[in-house]
Curated annotation (Swiss-Prot):
One of its GO terms (biological process) is arginine biosynthetic process via ornithine. Coiled coil: none annotated. Pathway: Amino-acid biosynthesis; L-arginine biosynthesis; L-arginine from L-ornithine and carbamoyl phosphate: step 3/3. Belongs to the lyase 1 family. Argininosuccinate lyase subfamily. It comes from Methanosphaerula palustris (strain ATCC BAA-1556 / DSM 19958 / E1-9c). This is Argininosuccinate lyase. One of its GO terms (cellular component) is cytosol. The gene is argH. GO terms for molecular function: argininosuccinate lyase activity. It comes from the Archaea.
Length: 494
Protein backbone atom coordinates (compact mmCIF):
# COMPACT_ATOMS: atom_id res chain seq x y z
CA UNK A 1 0.00 0.00 0.00
CA UNK A 2 1.26 3.48 -0.89
CA UNK A 3 1.66 5.82 2.09
CA UNK A 4 1.71 9.59 2.39
CA UNK A 5 5.45 10.33 2.16
CA UNK A 6 5.00 13.86 3.47
CA UNK A 7 3.63 12.64 6.81
CA UNK A 8 6.41 10.12 7.43
CA UNK A 9 9.27 11.31 9.63
CA UNK A 10 7.95 13.90 12.07
CA UNK A 11 4.58 12.25 12.68
CA UNK A 12 3.70 8.71 13.68
CA UNK A 13 0.55 6.67 13.74
CA UNK A 14 -2.36 6.48 11.36
CA UNK A 15 -5.16 9.01 11.31
CA UNK A 16 -8.74 7.89 11.69
CA UNK A 17 -10.83 7.94 8.55
CA UNK A 18 -12.86 10.89 9.81
CA UNK A 19 -9.79 13.01 10.52
CA UNK A 20 -8.23 12.09 7.17
CA UNK A 21 -11.42 13.03 5.34
CA UNK A 22 -11.67 16.26 7.34
CA UNK A 23 -8.16 17.35 6.33
CA UNK A 24 -8.24 16.12 2.74
CA UNK A 25 -8.74 18.56 -0.12
CA UNK A 26 -9.19 15.83 -2.72
CA UNK A 27 -12.53 17.06 -4.12
CA UNK A 28 -11.25 20.55 -4.88
CA UNK A 29 -7.89 19.13 -5.99
CA UNK A 30 -9.45 17.60 -9.10
CA UNK A 31 -9.48 21.15 -10.46
CA UNK A 32 -5.71 21.53 -10.14
CA UNK A 33 -4.41 17.99 -10.74
CA UNK A 34 -3.38 18.69 -14.33
CA UNK A 35 -1.82 22.00 -13.32
CA UNK A 36 0.10 20.27 -10.53
CA UNK A 37 1.77 17.90 -12.98
CA UNK A 38 2.77 20.83 -15.20
CA UNK A 39 4.20 22.64 -12.18
CA UNK A 40 6.17 19.50 -11.27
CA UNK A 41 7.53 19.25 -14.81
CA UNK A 42 8.60 22.90 -14.89
CA UNK A 43 10.21 22.65 -11.45
CA UNK A 44 12.07 19.48 -12.40
CA UNK A 45 13.34 21.04 -15.62
CA UNK A 46 14.61 24.00 -13.65
CA UNK A 47 16.35 21.78 -11.06
CA UNK A 48 18.09 19.90 -13.87
CA UNK A 49 18.98 23.06 -15.77
CA UNK A 50 20.48 24.60 -12.62
CA UNK A 51 22.54 21.48 -11.88
CA UNK A 52 20.64 20.83 -8.66
CA UNK A 53 19.51 17.37 -9.74
CA UNK A 54 21.51 14.85 -11.75
CA UNK A 55 20.43 13.68 -15.23
CA UNK A 56 19.52 10.11 -14.26
CA UNK A 57 16.99 10.86 -11.49
CA UNK A 58 15.69 13.81 -13.52
CA UNK A 59 14.95 11.55 -16.50
CA UNK A 60 13.38 8.83 -14.35
CA UNK A 61 11.05 11.25 -12.59
CA UNK A 62 10.24 13.07 -15.84
CA UNK A 63 9.18 9.80 -17.44
CA UNK A 64 6.49 9.33 -14.79
CA UNK A 65 5.38 12.96 -14.87
CA UNK A 66 4.99 12.91 -18.65
CA UNK A 67 2.85 9.80 -18.33
CA UNK A 68 0.68 11.54 -15.72
CA UNK A 69 0.41 14.53 -18.05
CA UNK A 70 -0.62 12.43 -21.05
CA UNK A 71 -2.88 9.88 -19.34
CA UNK A 72 -4.15 11.87 -16.39
CA UNK A 73 -3.25 11.69 -12.72
CA UNK A 74 -4.03 8.21 -11.35
CA UNK A 75 -7.12 8.09 -9.17
CA UNK A 76 -5.02 6.68 -6.31
CA UNK A 77 -3.45 10.12 -5.90
CA UNK A 78 -6.81 11.42 -4.69
CA UNK A 79 -7.07 8.89 -1.86
CA UNK A 80 -8.16 10.43 1.44
CA UNK A 81 -4.98 9.23 3.16
CA UNK A 82 -3.16 11.99 1.28
CA UNK A 83 -3.83 15.45 2.61
CA UNK A 84 -3.80 16.85 -0.90
CA UNK A 85 -3.03 16.04 -4.53
CA UNK A 86 0.56 17.26 -4.14
CA UNK A 87 1.31 14.61 -1.52
CA UNK A 88 -0.60 12.05 -3.55
CA UNK A 89 1.40 12.61 -6.73
CA UNK A 90 4.74 12.65 -4.91
CA UNK A 91 3.85 9.47 -3.03
CA UNK A 92 2.87 7.65 -6.23
CA UNK A 93 6.01 8.88 -7.95
CA UNK A 94 8.29 7.67 -5.15
CA UNK A 95 6.48 4.33 -5.04
CA UNK A 96 7.30 3.90 -8.72
CA UNK A 97 10.89 5.16 -9.06
CA UNK A 98 12.07 5.01 -5.45
CA UNK A 99 12.87 7.70 -2.93
CA UNK A 100 16.47 8.05 -4.12
CA UNK A 101 15.21 9.48 -7.41
CA UNK A 102 11.61 10.53 -6.75
CA UNK A 103 12.46 12.10 -3.40
CA UNK A 104 14.50 14.79 -5.16
CA UNK A 105 11.56 16.44 -6.95
CA UNK A 106 10.60 18.53 -3.93
CA UNK A 107 14.03 20.17 -3.61
CA UNK A 108 13.74 23.94 -3.32
CA UNK A 109 10.00 24.20 -2.92
CA UNK A 110 7.13 23.69 -0.50
CA UNK A 111 3.53 22.71 -0.92
CA UNK A 112 2.82 26.32 -0.01
CA UNK A 113 4.24 27.77 -3.21
CA UNK A 114 3.25 24.67 -5.17
CA UNK A 115 -0.47 24.97 -4.43
CA UNK A 116 -0.45 28.74 -4.96
CA UNK A 117 1.13 28.19 -8.38
CA UNK A 118 -1.39 25.50 -9.31
CA UNK A 119 -4.30 27.70 -8.27
CA UNK A 120 -3.05 30.60 -10.34
CA UNK A 121 -2.29 28.39 -13.34
CA UNK A 122 -5.78 26.88 -13.40
CA UNK A 123 -7.50 30.14 -12.54
CA UNK A 124 -5.83 31.85 -15.50
CA UNK A 125 -7.39 29.23 -17.77
CA UNK A 126 -10.79 29.63 -16.15
CA UNK A 127 -10.73 33.42 -16.39
CA UNK A 128 -10.13 33.14 -20.13
CA UNK A 129 -12.99 30.63 -20.41
CA UNK A 130 -15.38 32.91 -18.53
CA UNK A 131 -14.12 35.93 -20.44
CA UNK A 132 -14.85 34.14 -23.68
CA UNK A 133 -18.37 33.32 -22.45
CA UNK A 134 -19.02 36.92 -21.42
CA UNK A 135 -17.74 38.18 -24.75
CA UNK A 136 -20.02 35.68 -26.50
CA UNK A 137 -22.98 36.94 -24.46
CA UNK A 138 -22.15 40.51 -25.46
CA UNK A 139 -22.04 39.40 -29.09
CA UNK A 140 -25.52 37.85 -28.78
CA UNK A 141 -26.93 41.00 -27.19
CA UNK A 142 -25.37 43.28 -29.80
CA UNK A 143 -26.63 41.06 -32.62
CA UNK A 144 -30.17 41.10 -31.19
CA UNK A 145 -29.97 44.87 -30.77
CA UNK A 146 -29.12 45.19 -34.45
CA UNK A 147 -32.37 43.40 -35.28
CA UNK A 148 -34.49 45.62 -33.03
CA UNK A 149 -33.36 49.22 -33.51
CA UNK A 150 -36.95 50.11 -34.52
CA UNK A 151 -38.73 47.83 -32.03
CA UNK A 152 -40.49 50.27 -29.71
CA UNK A 153 -41.15 49.20 -26.13
CA UNK A 154 -41.92 50.75 -22.76
CA UNK A 155 -39.06 51.59 -20.47
CA UNK A 156 -39.66 51.12 -16.77
CA UNK A 157 -38.62 52.64 -13.48
CA UNK A 158 -39.95 51.11 -10.26
CA UNK A 159 -41.57 48.50 -12.56
CA UNK A 160 -43.94 51.21 -13.80
CA UNK A 161 -44.24 52.61 -17.32
CA UNK A 162 -41.72 55.45 -17.50
CA UNK A 163 -40.62 56.46 -21.02
CA UNK A 164 -40.69 54.75 -24.41
CA UNK A 165 -37.46 53.23 -25.63
CA UNK A 166 -36.46 50.48 -28.04
CA UNK A 167 -35.65 46.85 -27.47
CA UNK A 168 -32.23 47.55 -28.97
CA UNK A 169 -31.56 50.27 -26.40
CA UNK A 170 -32.65 47.96 -23.60
CA UNK A 171 -30.50 45.06 -24.79
CA UNK A 172 -27.49 47.32 -25.21
CA UNK A 173 -27.77 48.38 -21.58
CA UNK A 174 -26.92 44.78 -20.67
CA UNK A 175 -24.27 44.49 -23.37
CA UNK A 176 -22.50 47.53 -21.94
CA UNK A 177 -22.67 46.15 -18.40
CA UNK A 178 -21.31 42.78 -19.49
CA UNK A 179 -18.54 44.48 -21.45
CA UNK A 180 -17.39 46.03 -18.16
CA UNK A 181 -17.50 42.57 -16.61
CA UNK A 182 -15.14 41.40 -19.34
CA UNK A 183 -12.82 44.33 -18.66
CA UNK A 184 -12.74 43.38 -14.97
CA UNK A 185 -12.02 39.72 -15.71
CA UNK A 186 -9.17 40.53 -18.11
CA UNK A 187 -7.73 43.05 -15.67
CA UNK A 188 -7.85 40.49 -12.87
CA UNK A 189 -6.22 37.96 -15.19
CA UNK A 190 -3.13 40.18 -15.41
CA UNK A 191 -2.69 40.06 -11.63
CA UNK A 192 -3.44 36.34 -11.36
CA UNK A 193 -0.89 35.59 -14.08
CA UNK A 194 2.15 35.83 -11.77
CA UNK A 195 4.19 32.87 -10.55
CA UNK A 196 4.79 32.26 -6.82
CA UNK A 197 6.84 29.12 -7.54
CA UNK A 198 10.18 29.19 -5.75
CA UNK A 199 8.88 31.07 -2.73
CA UNK A 200 8.95 27.70 -0.91
CA UNK A 201 7.35 27.71 2.56
CA UNK A 202 7.61 31.53 2.72
CA UNK A 203 11.33 32.33 3.08
CA UNK A 204 12.36 31.11 -0.40
CA UNK A 205 15.25 28.63 -0.60
CA UNK A 206 19.02 28.36 -0.36
CA UNK A 207 19.22 26.41 -3.62
CA UNK A 208 20.26 28.36 -6.74
CA UNK A 209 16.84 28.10 -8.38
CA UNK A 210 15.63 30.20 -11.32
CA UNK A 211 12.13 31.51 -10.64
CA UNK A 212 11.95 33.43 -13.90
CA UNK A 213 12.59 30.23 -15.85
CA UNK A 214 9.72 28.30 -14.28
CA UNK A 215 7.42 31.30 -14.64
CA UNK A 216 8.17 31.52 -18.37
CA UNK A 217 7.83 27.78 -18.94
CA UNK A 218 4.41 27.75 -17.28
CA UNK A 219 3.16 30.70 -19.32
CA UNK A 220 3.12 33.25 -16.52
CA UNK A 221 3.88 36.84 -17.43
CA UNK A 222 6.13 37.36 -14.44
CA UNK A 223 7.10 36.40 -10.89
CA UNK A 224 5.37 37.35 -7.66
CA UNK A 225 8.50 38.66 -5.98
CA UNK A 226 8.11 38.78 -2.20
CA UNK A 227 8.24 35.14 -1.13
CA UNK A 228 6.09 35.64 1.96
CA UNK A 229 3.34 37.42 0.05
CA UNK A 230 3.62 34.89 -2.77
CA UNK A 231 2.51 31.93 -0.64
CA UNK A 232 0.15 33.65 1.79
CA UNK A 233 -1.95 35.87 -0.43
CA UNK A 234 -5.24 34.77 -1.93
CA UNK A 235 -6.28 38.22 -3.06
CA UNK A 236 -6.15 36.95 -6.63
CA UNK A 237 -8.88 34.43 -5.79
CA UNK A 238 -10.89 37.05 -3.92
CA UNK A 239 -10.69 39.38 -6.89
CA UNK A 240 -11.76 36.67 -9.32
CA UNK A 241 -14.71 35.74 -7.11
CA UNK A 242 -15.69 39.39 -6.72
CA UNK A 243 -15.64 39.76 -10.50
CA UNK A 244 -17.83 36.68 -10.83
CA UNK A 245 -20.22 37.96 -8.16
CA UNK A 246 -20.67 41.27 -9.99
CA UNK A 247 -21.04 39.39 -13.26
CA UNK A 248 -23.74 37.19 -11.78
CA UNK A 249 -25.57 40.18 -10.32
CA UNK A 250 -25.76 41.62 -13.83
CA UNK A 251 -26.86 38.24 -15.18
CA UNK A 252 -29.51 37.90 -12.47
CA UNK A 253 -31.03 41.24 -13.47
CA UNK A 254 -31.29 40.05 -17.05
CA UNK A 255 -32.79 36.75 -15.88
CA UNK A 256 -35.33 38.53 -13.71
CA UNK A 257 -36.53 40.64 -16.61
CA UNK A 258 -36.78 37.67 -18.95
CA UNK A 259 -38.79 35.83 -16.29
CA UNK A 260 -41.14 38.80 -15.92
CA UNK A 261 -41.36 39.38 -19.67
CA UNK A 262 -42.24 35.73 -20.30
CA UNK A 263 -45.12 35.80 -17.81
CA UNK A 264 -48.71 35.62 -19.05
CA UNK A 265 -49.27 39.12 -17.69
CA UNK A 266 -46.48 40.79 -19.66
CA UNK A 267 -45.95 38.54 -22.71
CA UNK A 268 -42.95 40.42 -24.11
CA UNK A 269 -40.89 37.30 -24.82
CA UNK A 270 -41.28 33.59 -25.37
CA UNK A 271 -38.40 31.42 -24.26
CA UNK A 272 -37.35 28.37 -26.22
CA UNK A 273 -38.65 25.10 -24.79
CA UNK A 274 -35.09 23.93 -24.16
CA UNK A 275 -34.78 26.53 -21.39
CA UNK A 276 -38.15 25.81 -19.75
CA UNK A 277 -39.82 23.11 -17.67
CA UNK A 278 -43.43 22.15 -17.13
CA UNK A 279 -45.54 21.28 -14.11
CA UNK A 280 -46.09 17.77 -12.81
CA UNK A 281 -49.76 18.61 -12.24
CA UNK A 282 -50.64 21.64 -14.41
CA UNK A 283 -50.29 20.53 -18.05
CA UNK A 284 -50.46 24.04 -19.49
CA UNK A 285 -47.42 25.36 -17.65
CA UNK A 286 -44.21 26.50 -19.34
CA UNK A 287 -41.93 27.67 -16.57
CA UNK A 288 -38.63 29.59 -17.01
CA UNK A 289 -36.85 27.24 -14.61
CA UNK A 290 -33.41 27.63 -16.18
CA UNK A 291 -33.44 31.37 -15.58
CA UNK A 292 -34.79 30.89 -12.07
CA UNK A 293 -31.95 28.51 -11.23
CA UNK A 294 -29.51 31.00 -12.73
CA UNK A 295 -31.01 33.76 -10.60
CA UNK A 296 -30.42 31.57 -7.54
CA UNK A 297 -26.89 30.71 -8.66
CA UNK A 298 -26.11 34.41 -8.46
CA UNK A 299 -26.73 34.14 -4.73
CA UNK A 300 -24.44 31.12 -4.55
CA UNK A 301 -21.60 32.99 -6.25
CA UNK A 302 -22.09 35.99 -3.97
CA UNK A 303 -21.98 33.53 -1.07
CA UNK A 304 -18.76 31.97 -2.36
CA UNK A 305 -17.18 35.41 -2.58
CA UNK A 306 -18.33 36.32 0.92
CA UNK A 307 -17.12 33.00 2.34
CA UNK A 308 -13.70 33.43 0.75
CA UNK A 309 -13.35 36.95 2.16
CA UNK A 310 -14.34 35.69 5.61
CA UNK A 311 -11.78 32.87 5.51
CA UNK A 312 -8.90 35.18 4.60
CA UNK A 313 -9.92 37.97 6.98
CA UNK A 314 -7.38 38.54 9.78
CA UNK A 315 -5.09 35.64 8.87
CA UNK A 316 -1.53 36.32 10.05
CA UNK A 317 1.43 35.99 7.71
CA UNK A 318 2.34 33.76 6.16
CA UNK A 319 0.69 30.45 5.18
CA UNK A 320 -2.23 29.06 7.19
CA UNK A 321 -4.21 25.90 6.50
CA UNK A 322 -7.41 27.98 6.55
CA UNK A 323 -6.58 28.83 2.94
CA UNK A 324 -7.41 25.26 1.90
CA UNK A 325 -11.03 25.93 2.82
CA UNK A 326 -11.17 28.84 0.38
CA UNK A 327 -10.42 26.72 -2.68
CA UNK A 328 -13.78 24.91 -2.98
CA UNK A 329 -15.55 28.28 -2.89
CA UNK A 330 -13.30 29.53 -5.68
CA UNK A 331 -14.06 26.67 -8.03
CA UNK A 332 -17.76 26.65 -7.14
CA UNK A 333 -18.06 30.35 -7.91
CA UNK A 334 -16.02 30.11 -11.09
CA UNK A 335 -17.96 27.08 -12.32
CA UNK A 336 -21.39 28.56 -11.60
CA UNK A 337 -20.53 31.86 -13.26
CA UNK A 338 -19.14 30.34 -16.45
CA UNK A 339 -22.02 27.90 -16.93
CA UNK A 340 -24.62 30.58 -16.20
CA UNK A 341 -23.27 33.02 -18.76
CA UNK A 342 -23.11 30.40 -21.50
CA UNK A 343 -26.68 29.29 -20.78
CA UNK A 344 -27.95 32.88 -20.65
CA UNK A 345 -26.45 33.53 -24.08
CA UNK A 346 -28.26 30.47 -25.40
CA UNK A 347 -31.57 31.51 -23.84
CA UNK A 348 -31.35 34.98 -25.37
CA UNK A 349 -30.26 33.83 -28.82
CA UNK A 350 -33.23 31.44 -29.08
CA UNK A 351 -35.87 33.71 -27.52
CA UNK A 352 -38.74 35.20 -29.55
CA UNK A 353 -39.62 38.79 -28.70
CA UNK A 354 -43.23 39.94 -29.04
CA UNK A 355 -42.49 43.33 -30.56
CA UNK A 356 -46.15 44.04 -31.39
CA UNK A 357 -47.16 43.78 -27.75
CA UNK A 358 -44.15 45.84 -26.72
CA UNK A 359 -45.17 48.59 -29.11
CA UNK A 360 -48.76 48.50 -27.83
CA UNK A 361 -47.54 48.92 -24.27
CA UNK A 362 -45.03 51.65 -25.14
CA UNK A 363 -47.56 54.48 -25.09
CA UNK A 364 -49.53 53.36 -22.06
CA UNK A 365 -49.31 54.69 -18.54
CA UNK A 366 -48.69 58.25 -19.79
CA UNK A 367 -45.16 57.14 -20.66
CA UNK A 368 -44.81 59.95 -23.22
CA UNK A 369 -45.45 62.65 -20.61
CA UNK A 370 -41.76 63.53 -20.32
CA UNK A 371 -41.46 64.30 -24.03
CA UNK A 372 -44.65 66.36 -23.78
CA UNK A 373 -43.13 68.45 -20.99
CA UNK A 374 -39.88 68.78 -22.97
CA UNK A 375 -41.83 69.91 -26.04
CA UNK A 376 -43.59 72.62 -23.99
CA UNK A 377 -40.18 73.85 -22.85
CA UNK A 378 -38.89 73.97 -26.43
CA UNK A 379 -42.03 75.32 -28.11
CA UNK A 380 -43.52 77.53 -25.41
CA UNK A 381 -40.39 78.70 -23.59
CA UNK A 382 -41.60 77.44 -20.22
CA UNK A 383 -39.27 76.51 -17.38
CA UNK A 384 -39.07 72.74 -17.20
CA UNK A 385 -40.44 72.60 -13.65
CA UNK A 386 -43.46 74.64 -14.73
CA UNK A 387 -44.08 72.33 -17.68
CA UNK A 388 -43.61 69.36 -15.33
CA UNK A 389 -46.30 70.74 -13.00
CA UNK A 390 -48.75 71.36 -15.84
CA UNK A 391 -48.34 67.91 -17.37
CA UNK A 392 -48.53 66.30 -13.93
CA UNK A 393 -51.86 68.01 -13.22
CA UNK A 394 -53.19 66.92 -16.61
CA UNK A 395 -52.18 63.32 -15.88
CA UNK A 396 -53.99 63.56 -12.56
CA UNK A 397 -57.12 64.60 -14.45
CA UNK A 398 -56.89 61.42 -16.51
CA UNK A 399 -55.96 62.67 -19.99
CA UNK A 400 -53.25 64.43 -21.97
CA UNK A 401 -54.84 66.71 -24.54
CA UNK A 402 -54.58 70.38 -25.38
CA UNK A 403 -57.78 70.96 -23.38
CA UNK A 404 -56.53 69.15 -20.27
CA UNK A 405 -53.18 70.91 -20.49
CA UNK A 406 -54.76 74.36 -20.81
CA UNK A 407 -56.96 73.62 -17.82
CA UNK A 408 -53.95 72.43 -15.83
CA UNK A 409 -52.06 75.61 -16.76
CA UNK A 410 -54.68 77.94 -15.31
CA UNK A 411 -53.20 77.43 -11.88
CA UNK A 412 -49.96 78.87 -13.24
CA UNK A 413 -51.78 81.78 -14.92
CA UNK A 414 -50.39 80.64 -18.27
CA UNK A 415 -52.19 80.72 -21.62
CA UNK A 416 -50.68 77.83 -23.55
CA UNK A 417 -52.49 78.72 -26.77
CA UNK A 418 -50.97 82.17 -26.70
CA UNK A 419 -47.58 80.55 -26.29
CA UNK A 420 -48.13 78.56 -29.50
CA UNK A 421 -49.20 75.17 -28.18
CA UNK A 422 -51.51 73.30 -30.56
CA UNK A 423 -53.26 69.94 -30.53
CA UNK A 424 -51.02 68.81 -33.38
CA UNK A 425 -47.91 69.53 -31.32
CA UNK A 426 -49.39 67.74 -28.34
CA UNK A 427 -50.26 64.64 -30.34
CA UNK A 428 -46.83 64.58 -31.98
CA UNK A 429 -45.17 64.68 -28.56
CA UNK A 430 -47.38 61.83 -27.39
CA UNK A 431 -46.17 59.57 -30.22
CA UNK A 432 -43.64 57.12 -28.69
CA UNK A 433 -41.52 57.06 -31.85
CA UNK A 434 -41.31 60.86 -31.85
CA UNK A 435 -40.06 60.86 -28.27
CA UNK A 436 -37.51 58.15 -28.98
CA UNK A 437 -36.07 59.90 -32.02
CA UNK A 438 -35.85 63.16 -30.08
CA UNK A 439 -33.41 61.44 -27.74
CA UNK A 440 -30.53 61.23 -30.17
CA UNK A 441 -27.75 62.15 -27.76
CA UNK A 442 -24.84 59.79 -27.18
CA UNK A 443 -26.22 56.66 -25.56
CA UNK A 444 -29.85 57.53 -26.24
CA UNK A 445 -32.53 55.29 -27.79
CA UNK A 446 -32.80 57.06 -31.16
CA UNK A 447 -31.95 54.84 -34.11
CA UNK A 448 -28.83 56.86 -34.97
CA UNK A 449 -27.54 56.76 -31.39
CA UNK A 450 -28.24 53.06 -31.00
CA UNK A 451 -26.56 52.31 -34.32
CA UNK A 452 -23.44 54.12 -33.13
CA UNK A 453 -23.53 52.19 -29.86
CA UNK A 454 -23.84 48.91 -31.75
CA UNK A 455 -20.77 49.73 -33.84
CA UNK A 456 -18.79 50.63 -30.72
CA UNK A 457 -19.77 47.43 -28.93
CA UNK A 458 -19.07 45.35 -32.03
CA UNK A 459 -15.53 46.69 -31.96
CA UNK A 460 -15.34 45.93 -28.24
CA UNK A 461 -16.45 42.33 -28.85
CA UNK A 462 -13.89 41.97 -31.61
CA UNK A 463 -11.12 43.37 -29.40
CA UNK A 464 -12.12 41.05 -26.56
CA UNK A 465 -12.09 38.03 -28.85
CA UNK A 466 -8.63 38.96 -30.13
CA UNK A 467 -7.20 39.58 -26.65
CA UNK A 468 -8.46 36.24 -25.34
CA UNK A 469 -7.28 34.33 -28.42
CA UNK A 470 -3.82 35.88 -28.25
CA UNK A 471 -3.44 35.07 -24.56
CA UNK A 472 -4.62 31.51 -25.09
CA UNK A 473 -2.13 31.09 -27.91
CA UNK A 474 0.68 32.47 -25.75
CA UNK A 475 -0.17 30.09 -22.90
CA UNK A 476 -0.58 27.10 -25.21
CA UNK A 477 2.76 27.85 -26.83
CA UNK A 478 4.45 28.00 -23.43
CA UNK A 479 3.00 24.67 -22.28
CA UNK A 480 3.83 23.05 -25.63
CA UNK A 481 7.43 24.21 -25.21
CA UNK A 482 7.45 22.91 -21.64
CA UNK A 483 6.36 19.42 -22.69
CA UNK A 484 8.80 19.44 -25.60
CA UNK A 485 11.71 20.28 -23.29
CA UNK A 486 10.55 17.65 -20.80
CA UNK A 487 10.53 14.97 -23.50
CA UNK A 488 13.96 16.06 -24.65
CA UNK A 489 15.32 15.64 -21.11
CA UNK A 490 13.72 12.22 -20.78
CA UNK A 491 14.98 10.83 -24.11
CA UNK A 492 18.43 12.44 -23.91
CA UNK A 493 19.32 10.60 -20.72
CA UNK A 494 17.73 7.22 -21.42
Amino acid sequence: MIHDVVREGRLSGVRSGEVAAFLSSRNADHWIAEADVLVDIAHLLMLYRQGIIEPEPAAAVMDVLLRFSADGVPEEAFDEQFEDIHAGIESLLIAEVGIEQGGRLHIGRSRNDEVATCLRLRLCEELLVIGDAVNGLCEVLVSLAGEHTHSVMPGFTHLQHAQPTTLAHHLLSYAQAFSRDLERLLSTYQRVNRSPLGAAAFASTGYPIDREFTATMLGFSGVLENSMDAVSTRDFALEALADCAILMVNASRCCEELILWSSSLVRFVQLDDAYCSTSSIMPQKKNPDTLEIMRARAGSVIGASTAALSIVKALPMSYNRDLQQLTPHLWEGIGDAGASIRILAGALSTATFNTERMETEAGRGFSTATELADMMVRECGLPFRTAHHIVGRAVRSGSLTLVSLKKAATGESIDLTALGLTEEKVQAALDPVHGIEARSVLGGPAVASVSTAIETLQESVKAGRTAIAEERYRRTTAITTLIKEARRLKTFHQ
